[in-house]
């Protein structure tokens, strides 16, 4: 006798299916909470990235335009407010208002991370952002996504760290999309990355230009190093060609959705990490985020 029951609900924001996901694009599930400050949170369940922020409606609008979530969770009674503030171009799902109670969401987050508070993550000053984050965890439970050990931290997005572009700027610059079907976007021109992780990181960097001169210079220094050391560049590129999508493979292991073929891919990818780690040990400046 086979026990029947709902084992998983697939929605746009929680898919782990490679046939649905774009390897070089994050698949974010977002939640928005309206309060004195608008809270917002983004989770890519396929990679484990968990981000939160709060601020003005204009700031949250820019975040939504830059992260382009596949699905947005909001309170049932705030449908019209969301539509007025952010438009109707998002896939939305409405949750009961009690899900967005601060006590409930904080408890959900602390239980998930197995901590007594969230101070260690540097997000305790974002109460409305954390309400949105807790609502995301609730939704994952509702859709039968209970194995989430790969989500190990939550990070804050600081408005002061980046240049934030509105939807009109993003559209006019044709960063990743164009209304002209024959047009070539900026990301298509500059993306020469060899790994899916690198492709997603490049897209993130393009969406969130840095303000800090020191941080910009640090990136330039890495580029200069590889420009002047072609042998090192080719050595790393050779290793990267054998690396699969480690972030998503590890997430599939954590969620018990990995296939035998993907286990082999993970093994082969890990074997390529050793040469990279040796490069890192011998010359730290030669290894960048990939």
Segments predicted by a language model, with ranges:
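Charged catalytic and DNA/RNA-contacting regions of genome-maintenance
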Residues: 1-225, 234, 238-241, 245-254, ...
């Amino acid at each position: 006798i086979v026990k029947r029951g709902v084992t998983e609900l697939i929605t746009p924001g929680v898919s782990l299916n490679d046939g649905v996901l774009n390897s070089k694009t994050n698949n974010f599930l977002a939640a928005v909470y309206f309060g004195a400050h608008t809270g917002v949170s983004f989770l890519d369940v396929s990679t484990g990235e968990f981000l939160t922020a709060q601020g003005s409606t204009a700031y949250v609008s820019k975040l939504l335009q830059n992260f382009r979530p596949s699905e947005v969770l909001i309170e049932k009674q705030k449908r019209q407010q969301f539509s007025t503030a952010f438009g109707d171009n998002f896939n939305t799902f409405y949750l009961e208002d009690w899900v967005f109670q601060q006590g409930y969401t904080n408890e959900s987050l602390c239980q998930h991370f197995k901590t007594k508070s969230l101070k260690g993550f540097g997000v305790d000053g974002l109460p409305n952002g954390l309400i949105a984050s807790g609502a995301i965890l609730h939704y994952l439970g509702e859709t039968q996504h209970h194995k989430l050990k790969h989500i190990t931290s939550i990070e804050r997005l600081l408005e002061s760290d980046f240049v934030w572009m509105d939807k009109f700027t993003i559209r006019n610059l044709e960063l990743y999309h164009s209304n002209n079907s024959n047009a070539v976007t900026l990301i298509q021109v500059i993306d020469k990355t060899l790994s899916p992780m690198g492709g997603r990181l490049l897209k993130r960097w393009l969406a969130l230009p840095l303000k800090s001169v020191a941080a910009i210079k640090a990136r330039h220094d890495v580029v200069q190093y590889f420009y002047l050391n072609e042998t090192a560049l080719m050595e790393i590129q050779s290793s990267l060609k054998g690396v699969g999508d480690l972030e998503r493979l590890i997430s599939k292991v954590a969620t018990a959705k990995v296939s035998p073929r993907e286990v082999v891919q993970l093994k082969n990818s890990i074997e390529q990490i050793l040469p990279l780690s040796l490069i890192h040990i011998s010359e730290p400046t030669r290894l960048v985020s990939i």
